[in-house]
């Protein structure tokens, strides 16, 4: 049995629990379990909810059938301690676990990238004892680090984080690369992902990554409020959104690259929530990142199809993952494609430029093996492409500072690995659009604090609890400390 996962929607009035139960034998004979939730340890005013149960998948080797059980608990109040318990297969109930709702006024959330539990397994998927043992060892190690990251992040907030946002790739093994293309191979990895005790009481909003996208097993473990068919890749569902306090979070499944559908989804989500102060988009691919994937044509092509829609819908912040290295951009506006290229161009040049040579473990930044003065036609075309996707003209303010006031553009942030299961080197030529980046092969996490007029980001490494970047704040509105400025309208100011 896996631990419950909670998600939040609309000012803590709803909590969503997803329980995946391992049921032996015929699923038709298995009654849907119940969840009980009430106030305080004595579960005062307890409510009972019967799970919505659906068939999940079957382990063809053991004939173990799995079902997915999901519950929506309604009417929860902010700043209240609840306890919940759910029914097990034998009819008994779990020990009550605490779930404390938080404030929806000034609040904090944790942002992480690519836990990718199981990725430290270097063996390719095969139906062998060696593979399954290596996978088990990797899950153990990656889950330990994932647990450490979540605990440190929660401690950093004083236990007050309202939820976690994950930028995708919860697990490693895709269905395509599983032995026999089995849906079940990833189950041990989801068990590892859900194993930290803190997740009994910490809601998680997940994003679909490329390692999640081809296996419906993802959908059996997570709830996605206000889900849409728009952005669906036909396997794990489409885009979804939720609101928390003054913020609209729009979670895009960009494994479907149909930008028009994502545009339509965002317009619908905003129309349903027009008064939110902050608009945050989360997607997997690092469309403005700075590590190995960031210069790939398929990533930059996705950038130029999505960015105009983000800007037209007044998105404030875009949170991404995929590249297992931290980066934060300048405020950007108006990035657009200036040269034509296809998704599969420059593969050889990208590999050559990023090749770290004989000692890759000692490098955190690729060595730039293609010289700027190369006369090779393929190299010249590649370097011209890199220059075109630097987006120098999109930088709203190139000064480095801690606070940006009333920006017109968007901040893009890419999360490093949160488990240490895999890292990528930074590209050798830092893009013009990057304000700061970091890679030292240590897991990191970000704590984001939100108020009515500020959105503040701090990012930490887990080995020594130190920040890897300065505190960065977006501020909306003219505040007392800048009212004396001798301009009619304060915009794009950094101080």
Regions found by a protein language model. Name each.
Residues 111-116, 168-170, 210-211, 254-255, ...:
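Active-site metal-binding loops of divalent metal-dependent hydrolases
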Residues 247-248, 283-287, 431-471:
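Extracellular low-complexity, Gly/Ser/Thr-rich intrinsically disordered linkers
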Residues 162-164, 277-279, 316:
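Conserved acidic residues
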Residues 35, 84, 251, 456-459:
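Short hydrophobic/aromatic-rich beta-strand segments that constitute the beta-sheet cores
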Residues 73, 81-98, 133, 178-275, ...:
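Extended active-site neighborhood of metal-dependent phosphoesterases/phosphodiesterases
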């Amino acid at each position: 049995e896996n631990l419950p996962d909670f998600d939040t929607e609309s000012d803590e009035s709803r909590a969503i629990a997803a329980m995946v139960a391992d049921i032996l034998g015929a699923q038709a004979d298995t009654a849907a379990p119940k969840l009980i939730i009430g106030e305080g340890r004595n579960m005062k005013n307890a409510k009972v909810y019967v799970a919505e149960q659906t068939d999940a998948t079957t382990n063809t080797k053991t004939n173990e059938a799995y079902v997915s059980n999901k519950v929506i608990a309604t009417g929860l109040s902010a700043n209240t301690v609840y306890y919940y318990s759910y029914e097990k297969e034998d009819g008994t109930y779990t020990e009550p676990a605490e779930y404390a709702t938080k404030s929806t006024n000034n609040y904090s959330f944790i942002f992480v990238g690519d836990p990718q539990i199981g990725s430290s397994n270097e063996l390719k998927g095969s139906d062998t004892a060696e593979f399954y043992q290596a996978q088990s060892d990797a899950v153990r190690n990656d889950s330990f680090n994932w647990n450490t990251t979540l605990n440190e992040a929660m401690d950093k907030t004083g236990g007050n984080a309202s939820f976690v946002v994950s930028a995708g790739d919860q697990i490693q093994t895709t269905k395509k690369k599983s032995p026999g293309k089995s849906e079940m191979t990833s189950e041990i990895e989801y068990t590892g992902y859900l194993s930290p005790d803190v997740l009994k009481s910490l809601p998680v909003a997940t994003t679909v990554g490329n390692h999640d996208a081809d296996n419906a097993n993802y959908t059996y473990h997570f709830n996605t409020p206000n889900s849409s068919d728009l952005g669906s890749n036909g396997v794990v569902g489409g885009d979804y959104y939720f609101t928390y306090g003054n913020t609209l979070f729009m979670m895009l499944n960009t494994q479907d690259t149909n930008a028009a559908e994502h545009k339509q989804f965002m317009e619908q989500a905003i129309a349903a929530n027009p008064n939110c102060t902050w608009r945050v988009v989360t997607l997997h691919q690092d469309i403005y990142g700075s590590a190995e994937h960031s210069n790939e044509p398929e990533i930059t092509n996705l950038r130029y199809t999505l960015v105009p829609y983000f800007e037209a819908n007044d998105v404030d912040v875009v949170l991404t993952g995929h590249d297992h290295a931290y980066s934060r951009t300048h405020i950007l506006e108006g990035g657009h494609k200036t040269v034509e290229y296809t998704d599969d161009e420059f593969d050889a040049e990208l590999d050559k430029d990023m090749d770290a040579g004989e000692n890759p473990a000692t490098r955190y930044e690729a060595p730039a093996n293609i010289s700027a003065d190369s006369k090779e036609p393929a190299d010249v075309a590649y370097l011209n492409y890199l220059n075109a996707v630097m987006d120098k003209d999109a930088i709203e303010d190139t000064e480095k500072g801690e606070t940006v006031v009333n920006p017109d553009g968007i901040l893009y942030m890419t999360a490093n690995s949160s488990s240490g299961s895999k890292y990528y080197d930074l590209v050798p030529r830092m893009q013009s659009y990057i304000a700061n980046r970091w890679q030292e092969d240590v897991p990191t996490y970000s704590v984001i604090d939100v108020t009515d007029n500020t959105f503040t980001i701090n990012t930490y490494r887990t080995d020594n609890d130190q920040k890897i970047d300065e505190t960065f704040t977006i501020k909306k509105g003219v505040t007392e400390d800048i009212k004396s400025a001798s301009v009619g309208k304060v915009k794009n100011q950094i101080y």
